[in-house]
């Protein structure tokens, strides 16, 4: 046997024999270390804690602890000083006061666990608590241990004093027997258990009856204190097996009926019994962990509330993101928030004059070919404010000056896009688009009387604004007809400066004829409002009937 031992084990055996332990005592101690059948988790299956090489002592540890005279330390006491004096726990005094055979067995069980490796015992107790859903608060209430110290000892193997470990092991042994009795009770005795539980609840609500019922010689203060602490009801805690069943049922039905909830109760209790290693027919032994229909109903109600709350948070986050993303678009896209690019000391907009090089001229030429007609006009504007349009832009005529743009660059050429789309769908209508000053309308009215009226859409883009524009005054002198159409801009007085753009497509396959007669000359510029008009041939007669003394504001579509 010696040959199978390591050098460390041989040294430990030699130290034990040299300390006065005889061979018979050592063999008897080894026999007592064998696990009992009803102990629960076997200690042999648990690994040893690192660095624990002390051989278990064979002296009866429990009796030396309960009398308060033992000063020696066992394995696990090193570094366990936490600064407080821990007297003999009441649970140990209570077990010492009992002289029954069951109490003797419990004391022997505690002595055996104290002689084992503390880390292995801690893992065994932790596994048992998880298996039966026992909270650490219950251990703290019964043993008087510090919950933080208890948690570190069970999870990390933090060293603990021998007295504290003895109190923990005593609770563990008694809890094992208590749960075993609960599951071993027959169905006939379930009624007695119900009466006892109701009596315990009454004593918990009215503790004065418990004090009156106890005689002076029945039990001392040390024995009654743990009993009063045990009267505290444990909070119900869902086990992992039951939670898995409930979440699967929640995916199928978020609001089950009463019959479905009762079926879930049976299924959960069955799973809890299988988790504890007992028959499902002994579900009444679950005690405070018994699943009821009310608890299932509350679980589903809480899940629905949590889901609704998460959806509300998601909607609020989505709305806030949409608001933040729209604010820059509104600030940059609104026509009333665009800053002017012209200096403040200069006149914003475009100036117009009737003399010298600043004169604004327009000419019109009428060309007929079948049922189509086109009027072209050109306006050359003087640039006053800084221009933001490239001189090489394709919207400028080859021989014309740069168009003055106030308030920023030109908007996208949506008008031309619409014209091109119309030309693809109805090329006949796209040939009748006319852009001319209102003064030219009076001149060409007679020539268009014989033309067939067609419905041609009027296209006018005012940078997305639907407000009326202030007319721009033009001089009414007409010149040669061979000029390209230009777009112009009219600043509004009651709104921010916005670029006005109008475009017209030239007549396809049109024939330009020589100018034979001059249209009527109009010397006074206030006779007609000089707003640029984009219209069709059917609306020319309507425009000619308008009063020449009134202004005709343009509206944007």
Curated annotation (Swiss-Prot):
Residues 1-32 form the HNF-p1 domain. Residues 231-311 bind DNA. CDD domains: homeodomain. It comes from the Eukaryota. GO terms for cellular component: cytosol; nucleoplasm; nucleus; transcription regulator complex. It is found in: Nucleus. GO terms for biological process: anterior/posterior pattern specification; branching morphogenesis of an epithelial tube; embryonic digestive tract morphogenesis; endocrine pancreas development; endodermal cell fate specification; epithelial cell proliferation; gene expression; genitalia development. One of its GO terms (molecular function) is DNA-binding transcription factor activity. Residues 64-85, 324-370 are annotated as: Disordered. Its main location: nucleus. Pfam families: HNF-1_N (PF04814), HNF-1B_C (PF04812). The keyword Nucleus applies. The keyword Cell cycle does not apply. Residues 351-370 have a biased composition (Polar residues). Residues 1-31 are annotated as: Dimerization. Residues 328-344 have a biased composition (Low complexity). Keywords: Activator, DNA-binding, Homeobox, Nucleus, Phosphoprotein, Transcription, Transcription regulation. The modification Phosphoserine is found at residues 49, 52, 75, 80. Residues 93-188 form the POU-specific atypical domain. Binds DNA as a dimer. Can form homodimer or heterodimer with HNF1-alpha. Interacts (via HNF-p1 domain) with PCBD1; the interaction increases its transactivation activity. Transcription factor that binds to the inverted palindrome 5'-GTTAATNATTAAC-3'. Binds to the FPC element in the cAMP regulatory unit of the PLAU gene. Transcriptional activity is increased by coactivator PCBD1. Belongs to the HNF1 homeobox family. This is Hepatocyte nuclear factor 1-beta. The lineage of its organism: Eukaryota, Metazoa, Chordata, Craniata, Vertebrata. The gene is HNF1B.
